[in-house]
Amino acid sequence: MRSSDITFVLLSVVATVRSHATFQELWINSVDQVGSCVRLPPTNSPITDLTSTDLRCNVGGTVGVSGVCSVAAGGNVTVEMHQQPGDRSCANEAIGGAHYGPVILYMSKVSNAATDTGSGSWFKVDQEGYDQTLNANCGKRSFTIPSTLAPGDYLLRAEVIALHVAGSVGGAQLYMSCFQLRVTGSGSKNPTGVLFPGAYSATDPGILINIYQTINNYTIPGPTTVFTG
């Protein structure tokens, strides 16, 4: 076995036994929504089956919660991830164990954010590639609700794809949560997007990748278009 292969195996084993994480909090224009509109997954474990409906909003995520968070088009939204439920300490890594990978945010227009199952079309509103931004920012990732987006109910899907054991098919670990939003404003745009499952393939270059080698260019999974209004 080559030394590079041995290094990959050892690092993969170490990373595998380290931390998982959950997107659990939402901020709107710097105001903490205190978990009022998140479909919180039952555990901090990842989804690895890219053909599962759990890919939409995580395990149990087809069932909504009562709260819906209101935000005006053009407003600022921040999602927040941590390793353990209720632990928001910035002293702890948001997602540990060398869980490097992209952060991707999707939205889906729905008739009722509290009851929709997430089976509709999802469009990208923000993405960032292979780095450790979440850990550097206390688990937070911010984006702007597109100013031209039509008003109504939406699901917001926040996702990290951890690539520490993604060198073989089925190794990528996906962590996602859905938030229930009500967008206000006078916009008229209704972007189309992709379905979950279906948006990702197990052999996509951003899904099947050995991160313990030199990476010159990383291809973020999903559609190339990011709707910013």
Swiss-Prot record:
Biotechnology: Lignocellulose is the most abundant polymeric composite on Earth and is a recalcitrant but promising renewable substrate for industrial biotechnology applications. Together with cellobiose dehydrogenases (CDHs) an enzymatic system capable of oxidative cellulose cleavage is formed, which increases the efficiency of cellulases and put LPMOs at focus of biofuel research.
Position of the signal peptide: 1-19
Binding note for cofactor: Binds 1 copper ion per subunit.
Residues linked to a glycan: 76, 217
Catalytic activity: [(1->4)-beta-D-glucosyl]n+m + reduced acceptor + O2 = 4-dehydro-beta-D-glucosyl-[(1->4)-beta-D-glucosyl]n-1 + [(1->4)-beta-D-glucosyl]m + acceptor + H2O
Biological process terms in GO annotation: cellulose catabolic process
CDD domains xrefs: LPMO_AA9
MF (Gene Ontology): metal ion binding; monooxygenase activity
Inducers of expression: Expression is increased 4-fold in cellulose-inducible conditions (in Avicel- and wheat bran-containing complex medium).
Entry EC no(s): 1.14.99.56
Reported function: Lytic polysaccharide monooxygenase (LPMO) that depolymerizes crystalline and amorphous polysaccharides via the oxidation of scissile alpha- or beta-(1-4)-glycosidic bonds, yielding C1 and C4 oxidation products. Catalysis by LPMOs requires the reduction of the active-site copper from Cu(II) to Cu(I) by a reducing agent and H(2)O(2) or O(2) as a cosubstrate.
Protein's UniProt name: AA9 family lytic polysaccharide monooxygenase E
Source species of the chain: Botryotinia fuckeliana (strain B05.10)
Gene name tied to this protein: AA9E
